[in-house]
């Protein structure tokens, strides 16, 4: 039974009913698109409740049905979030990169890649590998710069880090 049918939360049920009605009324929406949306919606619901295995299962189903690249990018991005939450950072990076291939302006994926690269840089620094750490920090900076160029009012903390570490590109500001 789909998650949307067994949820006891009134607000979630209301959202589900409204989303289903909107889908039914939208002209030109194929049955596959409707199924993809239902799986995506159920994946988001499961993810918000910490049911990551169920969320991934729903996202995989949505990904198999979804044809739109931008929609696919958000599915992949959410899968990356789950892997990041589970501490599977390399797998999270893979999914964020796949999302960016489909949607190069997905700022949240750019930011999350930068955050993970920065984290890996910190780990390398703690392990005494300054050369690897600096390379990872430089790579993180490039992703943050891309995100800031798209959304200049976001990522203030990243902008400050770029400035204080001398990695701020003057063209950025």
UniProtKB/Swiss-Prot annotation:
Keywords: Membrane, Photosynthesis, Repeat, Thylakoid, TPR repeat. InterPro entries: PSI_Ycf3_assembly, TPR-like_helical_dom_sf, TPR_rpt, Ycf3/AcsC/BcsC/TPR_MFPF. TPR repeats lie at residues 36-69, 73-106, 121-154. SMART domains: TPR (SM00028). It is a peripheral membrane protein. GO terms for biological process: photosynthesis. The keyword tRNA-binding does not apply. GO terms for cellular component: plasma membrane-derived thylakoid membrane. It comes from the Bacteria. Belongs to the Ycf3 family. Essential for the assembly of the photosystem I (PSI) complex. May act as a chaperone-like factor to guide the assembly of the PSI subunits. This is Photosystem I assembly protein Ycf3. It comes from Synechococcus sp. (strain JA-3-3Ab). The lineage of its organism: Bacteria, Bacillati, Cyanobacteriota, Cyanophyceae, Synechococcales.
């Amino acid at each position: 039974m789909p998650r949307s049918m067994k949820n006891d939360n009134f607000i979630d049920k209301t959202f589900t009913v409204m989303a289903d009605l909107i889908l039914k009324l939208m002209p030109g929406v194929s049955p596959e698109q409707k199924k993809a949306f239902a799986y995506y919606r159920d994946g988001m619901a499961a993810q918000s409740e910490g049911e990551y295995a169920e969320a991934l299962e729903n996202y995989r189903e949505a990904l198999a049905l979804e044809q739109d690249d931008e929609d696919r990018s958000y599915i992949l991005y959410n899968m990356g979030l789950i892997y990041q939450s589970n501490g599977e950072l390399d797998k999270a990076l893979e999914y964020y990169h796949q999302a960016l291939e489909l949607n190069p302006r997905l700022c949240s994926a750019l930011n999350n890649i930068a955050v993970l690269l920065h984290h890996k840089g910190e780990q390398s620094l703690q392990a005494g590998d300054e050369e690897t750490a600096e390379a990872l920090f430089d790579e993180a900076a490039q992703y943050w710069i891309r995100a800031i160029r798209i959304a200049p009012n976001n990522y203030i903390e990243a902008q400050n880090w770029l400035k204080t570490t001398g990695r701020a590109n003057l063209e950025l500001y």
